[in-house]
Amino acid sequence: MTVTLEDVSLITGLAIDGRPLCMSTDSDGWREQMIALISMAPTEAEADVEEGEEKKKRERKAAGAAFTWIQNNFATCPPDATDDVIQTHARVCMWYVVSRTLFPDSTGKNAPWMWLKALTVFDSKWSWGSATLAYLYRQLDDACCTITDSAGIGGNLLLLSIWSWERLPVGRPKSIRFDPWYADEHDELRRPTWAYKWDIVSEMTNDVNLMYQKYIAELDTITAEQVEWQPYGAGESLGYTKEFCLNPMCLRDKDLWLMRCPLICNWAVEFHLPHRVYRQFGLFQPHPPDWVDTDKALHRLDRRRQRKIKDWDKHHASYVTRFQLSVEQARSTARAPLCEHSQQAFDNYVRWFIGTTRVEILPPAYNEDILEEPVNFEDLAKGKYNRDVRKGQGVHAVPVINYVRTEIKKAADESQSILEKTPVGTGNDDGSL
């Protein structure tokens, strides 16, 4: 399972069609350029002081402004503002939202200059939807590879959270109510996105560490039958909810949801591979899915380690072209209808997936090599899991539950295989069984 362009469209309403968000991130003279765009920029002294505390000196100061600086200077647009002032406040507001929602880093303190630079022209036709998904993919990848105590995660966590709440019964809050929405019968573009279903939710007040352990246990025991595979509906009911009318932007690019294409956000190039999760679209899930080389070299590219590269539009020119061609092909070519979901095929896929991939977070209770017949109970007793149990240390029951479930499934499969190979009797009570 993964977040796809379908989720981006339904939850955020962001455009997928458009130019890939890939440009020069050169920050030389950024203060002068910022002043030209929004009439002011933080001074060096303001950049060094954040929320009243001296920041630690860094080798390279980030180009941009603290969110507190933006709030202090652009919180309210003057009632007698000219058109230019209104446009300036609108641009800064967009910069704030883009930096804080679509492309936040793990610190959550600053709005990078490059996102304001991307808003130099209001009607720039950027593919904001594909960019925010590329950035989220990269942030998830980086977070999985980070093991320090100070590790964090960035990206569009609103998108990730609602994707999870809609599909998985893990960590899902209760949706309490909807606040009244902006009422304008004649402007469909002011309607809410699917995220409005989670406008006001129950507050989680439990201990974070305890909830983390609880979520791990629930994720490790979840089964395919407990997943809501198509929460947005299907066919004619796709995107329909009785609670409110959906913004038409959420369905505008639905013909692009199945594109196999690179997703680009400046230095980050990730691949959108919906054929690996066709079950989420109600389609036939083959196994194994077609292999696609996602190029490990791309994952070594980021702004900090690759400071010499600034013109990302030139560096990633081939991927920009591939994205544009994918959009053209999806829009101009009559696609052959794909086969609908088959439960038997999906069961075969799940069996293959579990056999070739690590699907559990917690380590197994027992190693498979010591579970081969005959069972050596002395070896089992020496295992870490049983040692911890004897010492009275807190252990999860989940690994044992998964072990029992696996053994039951194995026994059922073996029994089925034996029955299939057993000769059928003649009907005169002379069968083999």
State the predicted function of each range.
Residues 1-433:
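Structural stabilizers in ordered domains
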